[in-house]
Regions:
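N-terminal secretory signal peptides and thylakoid transit peptides that target proteins
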Residues: 1-15
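Boundary at the C-terminal end of the N-terminal hydrophobic targeting segment
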Residues: 25-27
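Beta1/beta-strand and adjacent pyrophosphate-binding region of the FAD-binding site
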Residues: 32-44
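N-terminal Rossmann-fold NAD(P) dinucleotide-binding loop
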Residues: 47
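Aromatic pocket-lining residues of Rossmann-like dinucleotide-binding sites
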Residues: 54
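Conserved N-terminal/central alpha/beta ligand/cofactor-binding core
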Residues: 60, 66-179, 183-188, 195-196, ...
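Conserved beta-strand-loop-beta-strand element in the redox core of flavoprotein oxidoreductases
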Residues: 191-218
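Glycine-rich loop(s) and the adjacent beta-strand/alpha-helix scaffold that form part
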Residues: 207-214, 220-251
């Protein structure tokens, strides 16, 4: 179960397809405490899932989001998730397995995908799907096989958008007493003399696009900091290591 909780972030990041939708209107201005057990940076699927799991396991948690609203790119997601061997597939008599999805990912990804990450995404997709339902996410039961999928294994939220995941997750965090603080741009991971991360320095009241905005504040983390932010697609060097076709000429 511990491995499942750690790896759930990767599954939530990898499970959705993107479409252009307006950003979800979740703005929170709760007062920060000087210290938490866990600090989560980023309020998309991965960050909110991590925050829920940590809070359910007894941690005092805060989620920091640099934008004025929560949700990140997940708010623009199509709310779709590939789930091999799901309970919905079994009910409809569709044979599928994590191994089949892994083979599809390796084939479409030209063998460039990290084997361990593929293993996490494929083997934990079904339990993660069941976990989202416990958090209040409602999924349609009509299955589809998008793109390179060799089986009908993709499910979409009842709303047909990523908000079908974000809204229940935000409600759950409210129930758990976890603040999601917007307008907080993390600019540094703070470390002790041994190099252990013990907190963050962030710009409070940061306004996206106005780099001179915000006041630096330090927030301590007793147990750790979870990095659940995106944006790697803007890093040409990193993305070309993942796929040589994604050069700086790609617009």
């Amino acid at each position: 179960m511990q491995f499942f909780r750690r790896s759930m972030l990767q599954v939530m990041v990898s499970g959705a397809l993107c479409s252009a939708l307006p950003s979800i209107a979740f703005a929170q201005t709760q007062k920060l405490a000087p210290e938490y057990d866990v600090i989560v940076i980023g309020s998309g699927f991965a960050g909110l899932a991590a925050a829920i799991s940590a809070a359910e396991n007894g941690a005092k948690v805060v989620v920091l989001e640099k934008m004025q609203v929560a949700g990140g790119n997940s708010s623009r997601s199509g709310g779709m998730m590939a789930i091999p061997g799901s309970s919905v597939q079994k009910e409809q008599g569709i044979e599928d397995s994590p191994a089949k999805l892994a083979a599809d990912m390796k084939r479409i990804g030209l063998g460039l995908g990290d084997p361990e990450h593929i293993k996490v995404v494929t083997e934990l997709a079904a339990p993660t799907f069941e976990w989202t339902k416990k958090q209040g996410v409602v999924w349609r039961t009509d299955l589809t096989g998008k793109g390179g999928h060799s089986a009908r294994r993709c499910l979409i939220t009842e709303e047909g958008t990523g908000q079908g995941i974000l809204i229940p997750f935000m409600k759950k965090l409210k129930e758990l007493g976890v603040p999601v603080v917007t307008g907080m741009k993390v600019i540094r991971l703070d470390q002790n003399k041994e190099g252990r991360v013990i907190g963050v320095t962030a710009l409070e009241d940061y306004k996206f696009g106005k780099e001179d905005s915000g006041k630096p504040v330090e927030i301590k983390a007793k147990d750790g900091v979870i990095l659940a932010f995106g944006g790697f697609s803007a890093d040409v060097g990193y993305r070309t290591r993942l796929d040589p076709k994604l050069t700086g000429n790609l617009k």
